Each structure stands twice: as C-alpha cells, then as structure tokens.
A protein has these predicted regions:
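Short acidic, S/G/P-rich loop/turn micro-motifs used as interaction or catalytic elements
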Residues: 20-23, 64-68, 95-96, 113
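Conserved phosphotransfer microenvironments
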Residues: 60-81
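Alpha4 helix (beta4-alpha4-beta5 surface) of REC/receiver domains from two-component response regulators
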Residues: 74, 90-109, 113-114, 118
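Alpha-helical interaction/dimerization surfaces of two-component signaling modules
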Residues: 29-31, 50
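Conserved phosphotransfer cores of two-component systems
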Residues: 52-54, 78-86
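Acidic, metal-coordinating helix/loop segments flanking the phosphotransfer/catalytic sites
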Residues: 42-58
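A generic structural motif
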Residues: 34-38
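Non-catalytic signal-transmission and effector/linker regions of two-component phosphorelay proteins
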Residues: 1-24, 28, 112-129
Length: 129
C-alpha cells in the first residue's frame, strides 16, 4: 500500500473527481474544513495523469448515479495502471449499486458531510495499515 504522503502543511492529500461542479465544490470545502488538502477536477481523460503528477493519500471518485458507475470504474482502472499503489474510493449515494474490485473503498455519503468525512477518515486509516 501507498505510504501516507502528507503535504508540506502536514495535511493528508486528497484528489477528488466529480461530474458536477456544485457537488465538487461542496465536498471539497467540507474536506478542507476537516483538515484535508484537496485538489479536484471534473471528470476528464486527464484525471489519471493529474494523479500521477503528485502523491495523494486518497483519490475520491464521485459516483452520483448508476449511470456513472462504468465511467468511475474506467477512471479507477486508468489510475491503477498509472499509479498501481494509489488508494481509490468511490463516493456514492445509497441507491448506487457497485460491484467492483477496483476501488479500495466505497464511501456511502449521500449528501451527508459527516458521512463523507467519516468515510474518508476510515479509508485513510486502512491505507496506513
């Protein structure tokens, strides 16, 4: 597993990928308020390249609907090809059904900031083991 790669400010680094600008901004702000260093982008073919350019403790991929499962899976696979040891988690609502081997974690957050932070903390804790 990838070692913890805290930023120069001592905070854990998260790379967040979302398909909706407003959700991306809200989740980024919640994570920053809880002490994480966050860089984010909208879904794009360059997301895996961005992950490879810098060490991240966790990559979060938003999966807002069943429609997004395949693109999230493909992005996860791309990231793991470029950075095999990268810890990846999908952030989903409770209606999204995911059966996949790629993400290391599935965080069920709905629109609950506490569940998001708790899921990220748990995923990062498993990453350090």
């Amino acid at each position: 597993m990838q070692a913890t790669s805290t930023g120069s400010n001592g905070r854990q680094r998260i790379f967040h990928v979302s398909s909706r600008e407003n959700i991306k901004g809200l989740r980024d702000e919640v994570l920053r308020m809880h002490g994480f260093e966050v860089q984010s982008t909208l879904y794009s073919s360059q997301a895996s390249e961005e992950v490879a350019q810098r060490d991240y403790d966790l990559v979060l991929i938003d999966v807002e609907s069943d429609f997004r499962v395949q693109s999230a899976q493909e992005l996860c696979d791309e990231i793991k090809k470029v950075v095999p040891e990268q810890h990846v988690a999908f952030v989903c609502n409770y209606r999204v059904a995911i059966e996949s081997d790629c993400p290391d974690e599935i965080i069920r957050a709905e629109f609950n900031p506490e569940a998001l932070v708790r899921g990220v903390q748990q995923a990062l804790g498993k990453n350090e083991e």
